[in-house]
């Protein structure tokens, strides 16, 4: 492998670049392509879904049924899994369920002198469509991080879509789907899968809301169907921003950057070094690990084309850069870091401490790893139980006499 070509930039240069929004994901060229895919599936249903999948993903499906898996199929695949994998999946399942059960979403019921009941009630969204990313790698954890939360919320029907992959990877995804309580699974990915969830086909039922991360095409498809169906967010390629004041010992931090970069060539990695020194040793460690990594080519492209390595003077400058990015994952390695500072950071998820990593949070902590990307952390949040619920306002008046206490007048129209 050729030498890793990554450069460091100063605080002023990084700030100017980020203020111009050049680091945000640009998917303008995808819009028309995705629009045509959605219209095709919406109009032609199963036929379009099969044709697009066979063309893009090189599958050989003749019917949607060939790519469909019911509860019995999912159980059979779970039984094929290695016991160690089952143990790991069940460990993660327990943590996710325990975390989200601890989030309280109680109904509100009150009254006043006019209304005998004023309040809001919660009910689960009935039909959920879940997308689990794939392609060069598969992510069974994405199934657990969404489906289990939907189950805690009480959703009745949960349908999973994931891209075509090897038989071994497919068995893992389908087995995980069984553990997560999936109703049906479909071996379709990309914008056409989102369209099938949003509008349904002859075989696939329409979803009320779509969840799950994906690539640029998936994010753009979710953007275009929003309004006809609910979505969790426009999550795109994986992101990590690391703030560190370490001066030596970069093995773990290099691995953390690589863990995000290996998701795809469009993954974004930012490293902010507080104080002088450090980056040179980090670059050497990255070079070593990328050379040894199984997906070194993908990692190298992500680090060279979509990443930034920034030297700043202090934590204040680091916070400023971070908040211009609003990353999906933020790791903070800073001596004597104070918890009171956490609310100053804009990020989808924050991982504090040298022994804590985004990977740990993504797979085993408990909170969902479906997190806002592309600066959306400024106005949105990670997927949680509230996202699988709808609130309805409720009022009740028992006595007609109470109506006389309501004073409503027609607003005066301005004269012209």
Where are each of the predicted segments found?
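N-terminal Rossmann-like NAD(P)+-binding subdomain of aldehyde/semialdehyde dehydrogenases
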Residues: 1-126
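Short acidic-hydrophobic, aromatic-tinged amphipathic segments that line or gate anion-handling sites
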Residues: 3-9, 185-189, 309-314
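Conserved small-residue-rich beta-alpha loop and adjacent elements
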Residues: 110-175
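Short acidic loop-to-helix transition motifs that present clustered carboxylates
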Residues: 114, 165-169, 188-196, 337
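Conserved NAD(P)+-binding/catalytic subdomain of aldehyde/semialdehyde dehydrogenases
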Residues: 181-268
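NAD(P)-dependent aldehyde/semialdehyde dehydrogenase
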Residues: 266-382
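Single conserved hydrophobic/aromatic residue that forms the stacking wall/gate
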Residues: 406-416
């Amino acid at each position: 492998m050729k030498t890793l070509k990554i450069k460091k930039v100063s605080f002023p240069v990084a700030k100017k670049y980020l203020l111009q929004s050049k680091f945000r994901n640009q998917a303008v060229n995808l819009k028309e392509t995705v629009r045509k895919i959605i219209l095709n599936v919406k109009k032609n249903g199963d036929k379009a879904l099969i044709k697009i999948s066979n063309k893009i993903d090189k599958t050989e499906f003749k019917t949607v049924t060939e790519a469909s898996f019911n509860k019995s199929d999912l159980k059979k695949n779970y039984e094929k899994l290695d016991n160690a994998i089952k143990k790991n999946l069940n460990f993660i399942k327990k943590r996710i369920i325990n975390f989200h059960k601890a989030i309280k979403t109680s109904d509100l019921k009150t009254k006043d002198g006019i209304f005998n009941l004023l309040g809001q009630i919660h009910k689960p969204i009935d039909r959920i469509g879940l997308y689990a990313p794939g392609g060069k790698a598969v992510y069974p954890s994405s199934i657990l991080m969404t489906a289990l939360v939907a189950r805690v919320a009480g959703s009745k029907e949960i349908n999973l879509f994931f891209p075509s992959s090897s038989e071994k990877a497919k068995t893992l995804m389908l087995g995980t789907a069984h553990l997560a309580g999936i109703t049906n699974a479909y071996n379709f990915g990309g914008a056409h899968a989102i369209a099938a969830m949003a509008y349904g086909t002859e075989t696939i039922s329409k979803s009320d809301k779509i969840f799950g991360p994906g690539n640029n095409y998936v994010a753009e498809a979710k953007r275009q169907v929003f309004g006809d169906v609910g979505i969790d967010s426009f999550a795109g390629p994986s992101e990590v921003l690391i703030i560190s004041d370490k001066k030596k010992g970069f093995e773990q931090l290099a691995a953390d950057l690589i863990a995000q970069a290996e998701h795809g060539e469009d993954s974004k990695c930012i490293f902010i070094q507080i104080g002088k020194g450090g980056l040179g040793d980090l670059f050497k460690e990255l070079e070593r690990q990328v050379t040894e990594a199984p997906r070194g080519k993908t990692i190298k492209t992500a680090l060279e084309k979509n990443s930034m390595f920034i030297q700043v003077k202090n934590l204040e400058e680091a916070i400023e850069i971070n908040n211009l990015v609003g990353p999906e994952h933020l790791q903070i390695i800073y001596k004597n870091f104070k918890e009171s500072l956490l609310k100053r950071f804009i990020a989808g998820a924050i991982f504090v401490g040298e022994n804590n990593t985004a990977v740990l949070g993504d797979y085993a902590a408990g909170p969902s790893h479906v997190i806002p990307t592309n600066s959306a952390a400024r106005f949105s949040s990670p997927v949680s139980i509230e996202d699988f619920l709808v609130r309805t306002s409720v009022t009740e008046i028992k006595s007609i006499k109470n109506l006389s206490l309501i004073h409503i007048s027609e607003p005066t129209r301005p004269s012209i």
